[in-house]
C-alpha cells in the first residue's frame, strides 16, 4: 500500500512540475504571439492610414479644381432685386422689369428665362 502511495505521490509531483513548465511555456508563447499581432496590427493600421491620406488628397484636389473652374460666384436668386447694369442673377435667371408685383420697390428683378 505504501508503494502505491509513493508511486501516486511521485506521479502527482511530476505532473505538477511538468504542468508548471508547460504553463510558463504557454505564457511565453502567448506573449510572443501577442507582440507579433500588435506589430501586424500596427503595420495594417499604417497601411490603411496611408491609403486614406492618398484618397483624401485626391478628393481635395478634385474639389479645389472643381471650385476654381465650375463654381459660380455669389449670385442673386429668383425674385430678388438686381441691377440692370450689373446683373448677378444665378444661371438660368435673367434680370428683367417686373410685370405687376414689385413695380414700386425696384425696377429690375431676377426671373427665370422664358423659352421662346
Swiss-Prot record:
Any one annotated GO CC term: extracellular region
Chain residue ranges for the region called Disordered: 60-83
Highest taxon above the source species: Eukaryota
Disulphide bridges: 75-90, 82-95, 89-110
Basic and acidic residues bias spans: 60-69
Subcellular location: Secreted
Signal sequence, start to end: 1-21
Tissue: Expressed by the venom gland.
Chief place where the protein resides: secreted
Propeptide intervals in chain numbering: 22-74
Keywords assigned: Disulfide bond, Ion channel impairing toxin, Knottin, Secreted, Signal, Toxin
Residue ranges of coiled coil: none
One Gene Ontology molecular-function label: toxin activity
Comment on protein domains: The presence of a 'disulfide through disulfide knot' structurally defines this protein as a knottin.
Biological function: Probable ion channel inhibitor.
Similarity section: Belongs to the neurotoxin 14 (magi-1) family. 01 (HNTX-16) subfamily.
Designated name of the protein: U11-theraphotoxin-Hhn1b
